[in-house]
């Protein structure tokens, strides 16, 4: 792997932001390696390196096996069995030691030591990949908690494991201690931002997109990224918040909650293309907004939280754009919409038909009288030109002899339209 790619995948700081830390780093690298052909080998090699820096043997095996399938000749594609045996013994010894230590605390009824013993054991289980045992150990800490700070720390531990387990529904309950912190507490702002981001990820996982959007846009950019970088990065907040808002908010909401939101605008500075897309939508340049987003679709398909939602979010944004585009008009030509939203390629007519059928667009497509409408317009244009010529002749004190032909300008109906049209109800 060259130095540039190594920096991209493994550096702590990149593009002016703090990249996520903890177990989610491996998740993201491994996901990219399994999802992208161009980045496959480099991402999997970085995942192997990340796994080997920790204690999770199963993750190491998964990364090496995937790399072997993609690039069997790479040195990292061969299992380091000596490391695996050594790490397995180390993990086993550590587990036995921590369990014995905890049992001693229980025998001596030392409440604070029991809490810390469960925490140490839970973190150890988390590090070696036994997230169920980790959750169990953290859960046992509840009875020994004696302060608000300890309750908050426990909530963050439970949230971290719940996110890894994709147990979205439990996250809200685990965050209650963070949300109940008094605003006068110096840590309140940081804790509430952590809570907003975690709640946003959980709502996204449950397809509650508008709720998730508000969670992300209400996060404070003044909070150091180190507070929440085990679950997300500032760049994630900008992307998730921006995309979800575009899919669920109208133009006024986008302006008020994102562009006029000083705190969220700081997040958007890290992902300027998202800010441009939002600005284009708010200004009514919907096709430009969609074009920007489409150019970044491959990147979002590599995100561990966004990937499965990208098709739905993009479809919702496109539907919203079409509806907003049609709003000022009572009638629009299909070829005009084709140029605005599709360009060369399949007709937009089928898409509009589906939107009308699903009740997303209150309109109808007039494709029956198009020939008559086209002929009528041609007649109208011809008669209009004749009338202009006649007015010019009269203004020049000239005279045109001849009878008035039937079907003059006053006989032309003004309500006819050209080609296939969309008529808005």
Swiss-Prot record:
The PCI domain, residue ranges: 219-379
GO CC annotation: COP9 signalosome; cytoplasm
Database matches in Pfam families: PCI, RPN7
Keyword Iron: no
SMART domains, A to Z: PINT (SM00088)
Localization terms from the record: Cytoplasm; Nucleus
Alphabetized UniProt keyword annotations: Cytoplasm, Nucleus, Signalosome
Principal subcellular localisation of the protein: cytoplasm
PANTHER family, per the entry: 26S PROTESOME SUBUNIT 6, COP9 SIGNALOSOME COMPLEX SUBUNIT 1
Family named by the database record: Belongs to the CSN1 family.
Quaternary data: Component of the COP9 signalosome (CSN) complex.
Role, per record: Component of the COP9 signalosome (CSN) complex that acts as an regulator of the ubiquitin (Ubl) conjugation pathway by mediating the deneddylation of the cullin subunit of SCF-type E3 ubiquitin-protein ligase complexes. The CSN complex is involved in the regulation of the circadian clock through its control of the stability of the SCF(FWD-1) complex.
Protein name: COP9 signalosome complex subunit 1
Species name: Neurospora crassa (strain ATCC 24698 / 74-OR23-1A / CBS 708.71 / DSM 1257 / FGSC 987)
């Amino acid at each position: 792997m060259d130095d540039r790619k190594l920096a991209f995948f493994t550096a702590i700081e990149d593009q002016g932001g703090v990249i996520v830390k903890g177990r989610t780093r491996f998740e993201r690298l491994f996901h990219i390696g399994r999802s992208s052909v161009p980045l496959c080998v480099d991402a999997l090699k970085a995942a192997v390196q990340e796994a080997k820096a920790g204690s999770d043997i199963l993750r190491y095996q998964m990364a090496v096996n995937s790399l072997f399938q993609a690039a069997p000749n790479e040195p990292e594609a061969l299992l380091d069995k000596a490391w695996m045996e050594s790490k397995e013994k180390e993990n086993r010894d550590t587990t036995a030691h921590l369990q014995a230590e905890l049992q001693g605390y229980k025998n001596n009824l030392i409440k604070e030591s029991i809490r810390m013993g469960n925490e140490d054991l839970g973190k150890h289980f988390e590090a070696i990949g036994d997230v169920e045992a980790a959750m169990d150990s953290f859960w046992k800490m509840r009875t020994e908690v004696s302060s608000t700070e300890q309750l908050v720390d426990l909530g963050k531990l439970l949230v971290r494991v719940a996110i890894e387990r994709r147990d979205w529904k439990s996250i809200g309950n685990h965050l209650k201690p963070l949300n109940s912190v008094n605003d006068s507490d110096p840590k309140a702002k940081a804790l509430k931002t952590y809570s907003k981001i975690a709640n946003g990820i959980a709502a996204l996982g449950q397809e509650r997109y508008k709720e998730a959007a508000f969670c992300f846009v209400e996060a404070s950019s003044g909070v150091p990224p180190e507070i929440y970088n085990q679950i997300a990065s500032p760049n994630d907040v900008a992307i998730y918040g921006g995309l979800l808002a575009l899919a669920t908010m109208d133009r006024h909401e986008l302006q008020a909650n994102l562009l006029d939101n000083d705190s969220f605008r700081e997040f958007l500075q890290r992902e300027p293309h998202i800010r441009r897309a939002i600005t284009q939508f708010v200004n009514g340049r919907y096709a430009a907004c969609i074009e920007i987003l489409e150019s970044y679709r491959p990147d979002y398909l590599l995100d561990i939280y966004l990937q499965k939602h990208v098709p739905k979010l993009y479809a919702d944004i496109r539907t919203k754009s079409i509806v907003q585009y049609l709003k000022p008009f009572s009638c629009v030509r299909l070829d005009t919409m084709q140029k605005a939203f599709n360009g060369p390629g399949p007709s937009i007519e089928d898409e509009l038909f589906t939107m009308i059928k699903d009740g997303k667009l209150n309109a109808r497509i007039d494709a029956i009288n198009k020939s008559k409408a086209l002929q009528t317009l041609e007649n109208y244009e011809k008669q209009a030109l004749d009338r202009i010529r006649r007015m010019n002749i009269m203004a020049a004190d000239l005279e045109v002899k001849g009878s008035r032909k039937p079907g003059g300008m006053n006989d032309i109906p003004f309500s006819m339209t050209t080609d296939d049209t969309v008529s808005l109800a």
